[in-house]
C-alpha cells in the first residue's frame, strides 16, 4: 500500500458520501502499515497497529468503508460478524477461526496473483498439450523419413496453433489426459471447521498425481489444462511462506456488529456469546499465536477494525480491556437529506445510474431530474425519522417502490416511448410515494 492518506480518502470518496473522520482514520491506519515496513527490523517489531472502533447508526457507511478498504489494501482482508462466534467450550465457531480464515484468504489472494504471473507460460504449455492430442506423432522407419516428418509436422502444428488461437477448433472433441480431481465434501458441526479442512486436504493429497483420459471439447480442455499447468508452475511451499508473512505483517480484520456482544447495562441472564466472546477476542487483538494451515500465525501486527451501531448499548458496555485495545474511536454521523441527495447522484455507479442501466437493457430510457432526486431524498429522511432509521438502505426500498410499475412494464413502455426518456421529477415521486410517506402506518410496513 503506497497510496498516501489523501489518495486513500479520495478513492473512498468515489463510493462513500460524508463520514470524513472515519475515512481519515482508516486511511492513516493503512498508511501506517506501509510506514512501519520502512523501519529497521528492530524498531519495526515494536510498532503495533492502533486498532479502530467505528461507532454509528446502521446504513451510514461502516461496512461499505470496510468493503472498499479491502479492494484498496491489496492485503489479506477478512470481514466477520461478532455475532457468529461463541465462547470457547460452547457449540459454535471460536474466535481463533478468524485468523484461520484470514490465512485462507491470504493464500487464495497470493495464489491468484501468482497464477496471473505465470499465465503466459501456462497458456503456451496448455496449447502444446492440446496440439499433441490433436496431432498424434506418426511412426517413422528411417532418419530421412524422420526429418521430412518433422518439417511437415512443424508446418501442420503452426497451422493448427493459429486455428486454435482463433477459436476455430473450439467445438472439436478430443481425448486428453487430465488430473483426476478428488472432490470430497465433509459435513461437520459448527466449530469443527479446522478438522474438516485437514480431512479434505488429506483426501485431496491422496488423489494427487492420478490422471485419467477424458473426452472434452477443445475449449473446455484448453481451460482445464491451462489451470492445471498454472498450478504446476506455482511453488506451493514458497506461496505458503509468503502468505504467512502477508497475514502477520499486513493482515486486516474487520469485526462488524461488535455492539451485539456488549452487555447491555445491568441486564442479567445467560451471556454465552457476549462477555465470553469479548474475552476470547482480547488475546487475539493484543497479540497471540494461532495454529493455521500455513503454520503458527502471530497476531501482534494484524490491524483490527471493529464497528457497531450501539443503539441498544454503549461502547462503555464493552469489557474495559477490549475498550483499551481499540484506542482510536471514530463516530459516524446520521445521514441528512443533503447526504441522501448526494448518495443518489455522486458515487461511482450510483443507485440512479444502476437503475438507468438496468432499464436500458430493455431499450427504455429514464431520466432523474434534480427536483425528483431532491424529493426522493426528503422522503427517505422523513421515513427514517418517523420509523426505524436504517440510513442509506432506505433508498433501495424507495427506489424499488418508485420504479416498480416501470420495471414491470419496461418491455411494453420501450415500444411506446421510442427514444424519449421517462422523466422522474418531483411530481412523479409524489404521485408514487407521497401518500405512503405521509401515512405513518403505511410507511412503517411498506417503506
Swiss-Prot record:
Where does the chain bind ATP?
17, 59-64, 256, 321, 393
SUPFAM superfamilies linked = P-loop containing nucleoside triphosphate hydrolases
CDD domains, alphabetized: RecA-like_HslU (cd19498)
Determine the domain of life of the protein's source.
Bacteria
Keyword Membrane part of the UniProt annotation: no
Q: Tell me a GO biological process for this protein.
A: proteolysis involved in protein catabolic process
What GO cellular component term, any one, is given?
A: HslUV protease complex
Instruction: Kindly give the Gene3D superfamilies that the UniProt entry links to this protein.
Output: 1.10.8.60, DNA helicase RuvA subunit, C-terminal domain, P-loop containing nucleotide triphosphate hydrolases
Q: Name one GO molecular function term.
A: ATP hydrolysis activity
**Where is it located?**
Cytoplasm
Q: Which of UniProt's keywords are assigned here?
A: ATP-binding, Chaperone, Cytoplasm, Nucleotide-binding, Stress response
Q: Which InterPro entries match?
A: AAA+_ATPase, ATP-dep_Clp_protease_ClpX, ATPase_AAA_core, Clp_ATPase_C, HslU, P-loop_NTPase
Function of the protein: ATPase subunit of a proteasome-like degradation complex; this subunit has chaperone activity. The binding of ATP and its subsequent hydrolysis by HslU are essential for unfolding of protein substrates subsequently hydrolyzed by HslV. HslU recognizes the N-terminal part of its protein substrates and unfolds these before they are guided to HslV for hydrolysis.
Assembly information from the UniProt record: A double ring-shaped homohexamer of HslV is capped on each side by a ring-shaped HslU homohexamer. The assembly of the HslU/HslV complex is dependent on binding of ATP.
| Family note | Belongs to the ClpX chaperone family. HslU subfamily.
Show the HAMAP family listed in the entry.
HslU
Q: What is this protein called?
A: ATP-dependent protease ATPase subunit HslU
Amino acid at each position: 500500500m503506497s497510496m498516501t492518506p489523501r489518495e486513500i480518502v479520495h478513492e473512498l470518496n468515489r463510493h462513500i458520501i460524508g463520514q470524513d473522520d472515519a475515512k481519515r482514520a482508516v486511511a492513516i491506519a493503512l498508511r501506517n502499515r506501509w510506514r512501519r515496513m520502512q523501519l529497521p527490523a528492530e524498531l519495526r517489531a515494536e510498532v503495533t497497529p492502533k486498532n479502530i472502533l467505528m461507532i454509528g447508526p446502521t446504513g451510514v457507511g461502516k461496512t461499505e468503508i470496510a468493503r472498499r478498504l479491502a479492494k484498496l489494501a491489496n492485503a489479506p482482508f477478512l470481514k466477520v460478524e461478532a455475532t457468529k462466534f461463541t465462547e470457547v467450550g460452547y457449540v459454535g465457531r471460536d474466535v481463533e477461526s478468524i485468523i484461520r480464515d484470514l490465512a485462507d484468504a491470504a493464500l487464495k489472494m497470493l495464489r491468484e496473483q501468482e497464477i496471473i504471473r505465470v499465465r503466459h507460460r501456462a497458456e503456451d504449455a496448455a496449447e502444446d498439450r492440446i496440439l499433441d492430442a490433436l496431432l498424434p506423432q506418426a511412426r517413422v522407419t528411417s532418419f530421412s523419413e524422420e526429418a521430412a516428418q518433422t518439417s511437415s509436422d512443424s508446418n501442420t502444428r503452426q497451422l493448427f496453433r493459429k486455428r486454435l488461437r482463433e477459436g476455430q477448433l473450439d467445438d472439436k472433441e478430443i481425448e486428453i489426459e487430465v488430473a483426476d480431481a478428488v472432490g470430497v465434501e465433509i459435513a461437520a458441526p459448527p466449530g469443527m471447521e479446522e478438522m474438516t479442512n485437514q480431512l479434505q486436504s488429506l483426501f485431496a493429497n491422496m488423489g494427487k498425481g492420478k490422471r485419467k483420459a477424458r473426452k472434452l471439447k477443445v475449449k473446455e480442455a484448453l481451460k482445464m489444462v491451462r489451470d492445471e499447468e498454472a498450478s504446476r508452475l506455482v511453488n506451493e511451499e514458497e506461496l505458503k511462506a509468503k502468505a504467512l508473512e502477508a497475514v502477520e505483517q499486513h493482515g486486516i480484520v474487520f469485526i462488524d456488529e461488535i455492539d451485539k456482544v456488549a452487555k447491555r447495562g445491568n441486564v442479567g441472564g445467560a451471556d454465552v456469546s457476549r462477555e465470553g466472546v469479548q474475552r476470547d477476542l482480547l488475546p487475539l487483538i493484543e497479540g497471540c499465536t494461532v495454529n493455521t494451515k500455513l503454520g503458527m500465525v502471530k497476531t501482534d501486527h494484524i490491524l483490527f477494525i471493529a464497528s457497531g451501531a450501539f443503539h441498544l448499548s454503549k461502547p462503555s458496555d464493552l469489557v474495559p480491556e477490549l475498550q483499551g485495545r481499540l484506542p482510536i474511536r471514530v463516530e459516524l454521523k446520521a445521514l441528512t437529506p443533503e447526504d441522501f441527495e448526494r448518495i443518489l447522484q455522486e458515487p461511482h455507479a450510483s443507485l440512479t445510474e444502476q437503475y438507468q442501466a438496468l432499464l436500458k437493457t430493455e431499450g427504455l430510457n429514464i431520466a432523474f431530474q434534480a427536483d425528483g432526486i431532491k424529493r426522493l431524498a426528503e422522503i427517505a429522511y422523513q421515513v427514517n425519522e418517523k420509523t426505524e432509521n436504517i440510513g442509506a438502505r432506505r433508498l433501495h426500498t424507495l427506489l424499488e417502490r418508485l420504479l416498480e410499475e416501470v420495471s414491470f412494464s419496461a418491455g411494453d413502455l420501450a415500444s411506446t416511448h421510442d427514444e424519449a426518456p421517462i422523466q422522474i421529477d418531483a411530481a412523479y415521486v409524489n404521485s408514487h410515494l407521497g401518500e405512503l410517506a405521509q401515512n405513518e402506518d403505511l410507511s412503517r410496513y411498506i417503506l
